[in-house]
Amino acid sequence: MRLYSKDYLLDGKIIYYQLKKGYRSGIEPIILAAQVKNNFNTILDMGSGCGPISLIVAYRNPNSEVIGFEKNEIHHKISVLNNKENNFENLKFKVHDNCIFDKNYENYFDLILSNPPFFFTDKVLKSKNISINNSKYISELDLEKWLNNIILYLKAKGTAFIINRFENIDFMLEILKKFNLEVTTTPILSFKGSKPKNVLLKITKSDYFIEKTSNAIIIHD
């Protein structure tokens, strides 16, 4: 019996395997992949899981070099299978802990897409499922390392998009304020008039720190 299900992305254009019992992709990869509206030479999917963001971006941007970093080895193996099934020559996945800086990629990426774990380990009860545990829970120290590495991996004129919990926004902004960045926050609402659960951050390098707010993304009209 297979441990993963065979699903599809982009109305069947992309074959997508993911764990049956473990972390399964939600709306976040679709929102992040939709932010890629220009041509970028080098794109990093930081925390790539089974690869939904990378697969969509590689399909839509065949001339871009797309790399996925993922710590969980089971997720990584499935992402490699997904790449093989879809035959994307511009995509590769690496087993890598996003909280550990890889100097080989310093100032390397034009674009970074990332959906770090949402929940702080000391504030919630953690799942015993390793796949879910790796995908949903993180310490405050490790989230700070993750964000720091995003900035270090970006080129001077690079851009990053990050989705996380709306309630974590103040914590993340305090970290980002240490850098010269322009940060635009966009609340993500399930319905018009509802309270935001998640937030999209757009980050670009700047001469000094600037914070902006954009109109909310509403998932269900």
Feature map (PLM): residue ranges:
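Conserved Class I SAM-dependent methyltransferase catalytic core
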Residues: 15-17, 21, 141-196
